[in-house]
Amino acid sequence: MAFTKISLVLLLCLLGFFSETVKSQNCGCAPNLCCSQFGYCGTDDAYCGVGCRSGPCRGSGTPTGGSVGSIVTQGFFNNIINQAGNGCAGKRFYTRDSFVNAANTFPNFANSVTRREIATMFAHFTHETGHFCYIEEINGATRNYCQSSNTQYPCAPGKGYFGRGPIQLSWNYNYGACGQSLGLDLLRQPELVGSNPTVAFRTGLWFWMNSVRPVLNQGFGATIRAINGMECNGGNSGAVNARIGYYRDYCGQLGVDPGPNLSC
């Protein structure tokens, strides 16, 4: 009988220990351990890879931090746009709410975005728009972005397909494909991108999901190549370094490691 009581006490102690262990795993990991998407601590790809919540995450596996709106706070957004001059048209155009509203129309993005991805995205937004100063490409209207050989998305007479929005959407084939995806006639009305902030952010997100997100796991440098490959391999080292600088800054603000392969 005494043996049975002792065994029972030991069993209860063990259960208590494992209960506390599980609590710590969901997710109070030591600083050198990753918290996996399922709430457990470890160091290999199962913990530090896709879905990683905290710790030294790798690739796209960075802390989610919750919804898009909880990551892109008003303070985070203001820290960027407040660096634009008072005379900037974009300062009266781009808003944090228009970004969040646009992001929520892309559930695959909104439901899986990570802090590192937000840092990546806003580093490029910052570079492309001058801290959200510019809505349209400087002198863009004087440039020809019509690829006449593209018969799937033919250019409309008198319309310009120069860079607009946070990712500076350019060329008729991008306006056409993007508009088709979003249910908008951007071939005939490309100016919508420069007149409606939610549409502007939606075009940026469309380009992101199709051309940038697929290479996120390769590091920040691969995203530079996806957006403007002409800057890579010494094409424009100043621009590359500027993008990396913004990225490092935003990773710091959001509390995530920038990861490897930052340059291109």
From Swiss-Prot:
Coiled coil: none annotated. Gene3D superfamilies: 1.10.530.10, Endochitinase, domain 2, Endochitinase-like. Residues 66-264 are annotated as: Catalytic. The keyword Ribonucleoprotein does not apply. Disulfide bonds join 27-35, 29-41, 34-48, 52-57. The active site is at 128 (proton donor). Residues 25-59 form the Chitin-binding type-1 domain. This is Endochitinase At2g43590. It comes from Arabidopsis thaliana.
